[in-house]
Amino acid sequence: MAEGKEATTSSLSQGLTPHQDPDDAPKSPPNSPNSSTRKACYGVLQSWVSKKFMTGFVVLFPVAVTFLITWWFIQFVDGFFSPIYENLGVDIFGLGFITSVLFTFFVGIFASSWLGSTVFWLGEQFIRRMPFVKHIYSASKQISTAISPDQNTTAFKEVAIIRHPRIGEYAFGFITSSVTLQTDHGEEELCSVYVPTNHLYIGDVFLVSSEEIIRPNLSIREGIEIIVSVGMTMPQVISHVDRTTNRTPHQHSLRVPLNRL
């Protein structure tokens, strides 16, 4: 019995410092109700401040981005004609921007005429003969014609939804043309559907049966906005449009025999 008491005493003495009394062993502070209340209030206040800050950030971020892009665009466009006015001694901010807008407007009027279209056609033929420059011009023109208000030159005819890449999954695309496939079982109408990836000039082309294409009630510009915004401008409800009423007469059709594929 005495040996057990000695062992217990030695074990307690080993856990203490030489000058520390056993009664003065460190004890954890009691968890008082006041400290718990303070912690709860601090957590609620921190959560409230964080949510309000994020709400303000979400509200101000698109406004700031819109303002910065608009300001940069105005300064960029204003820089085309501002040096001319500065040489004339006229220093009015925004005058170059207004001049650029009016210049673009009158160029559009001139390009719509027979003389203007002829002049621009000759200039285009000259650019297409220049190495390296012709590739840049061709890519940028395809993007501009995709959103052109002229229905005779619009590259994208309709917005399309196709089943891709697997059954049960869908992808947005644009119908660019149609083709008639001749087989032993008859003819099948196919549509050339361009499925872009960001950016808009990079993507894949699929030949899809016209009966399997879903034509939504979306304009070309709305479809471009959906793709450029990575789906953030997607409407909550998309309805189907009848193909017989939505097909444009300028959409040309090509007949491709099967033995040529």
From Swiss-Prot:
Entry's Gene Ontology BP terms: stem vascular tissue pattern formation
Extracellular compartment residues: 78-91
Secretion signal: which residues? none
Which ranges form a coiled coil? none
Q: Where is the composition biased (Polar residues)?
A: 7-17
Cytoplasmic compartment ranges equal 1-56, 113-261
Membrane topology annotation? Multi-pass membrane protein
Q: Does the keyword Transmembrane apply?
A: yes
Give me the segments passing through the membrane.
57-77, 92-112
Matching InterPro entries, A to Z?
COV1-like
Where is it located?
Membrane
Task: Give the region (Disordered) as residue ranges.
Answer: 1-38
Arranged from A to Z, the UniProt key words for this protein are: Membrane, Transmembrane, Transmembrane helix
Q: Name one GO cellular component term.
A: Golgi apparatus
What family classification does the UniProt entry report for this protein?
A: Belongs to the plant COV1 protein family.
Mind telling me what this protein is named? Protein LIKE COV 2
Originating organism = Arabidopsis thaliana
